Amino acid sequence: LSERTGLPAVSYNKHPEFKDRNIIIYMGGLYAGGVLGLSSTFRNFTLSDKQKLIIVTVGVSDTNQQSVISDIQNSMKNQISDQLFRRAEIYHLRGKIDYQNLSLSHRAMMALMHKSLKSVPYENQTEENQAFLDTYGKEADFTDLAFLNPIIEEINRN
């Protein structure tokens, strides 16, 4: 997205300042039922009337399934204020994962999640959890850069 728009990409770990920004775009990976860094980035933040927030989630789950989107958005509601959630333009993209390239801590987190989910009968799993179980330990790439186009159009409207 940064390459296609010329907008700078800043890691949530750098605690970016938003007060002087008209448009804020947060792009985060889905991990363990939440959007990585979302809650810490927007803790105690209120969007001004002149600001626009775009949140983009990226994961391996099939975002054509309404139940997957509902699961993601329900999780997001627990991560950010109601004001931010209501005002945000939210997009859900599919990305890729390669377990061999994950850090040791991420692999450990995924292993714990896998172990936990395996104990739940398959028919009782959410579609997001089923996708996790189906791709666990493998490389999976669902990236389609064409799905950036609606986000770029939204950015250009401002």
Please provide the spans of the model-predicted regions:
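FMN-binding flavodoxin-like domain, especially the glycine-rich phosphate-binding loop
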Residues: 33-158
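A short, Lys/Arg-enriched amphipathic alpha-helix followed by its capping loop at the start of a domain
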Residues: 1-7
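Short glycine-/small-residue-rich Rossmann-like dinucleotide-binding loops
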Residues: 29-30
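Short acidic low-complexity segments
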Residues: 9-20
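Generic structural signal for residues in well-ordered beta-strands
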Residues: 7-10, 90
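Structural motif
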Residues: 22-25, 52
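Short, solvent-exposed polar/charged micro-motifs at secondary-structure junctions
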Residues: 19-23, 100-102
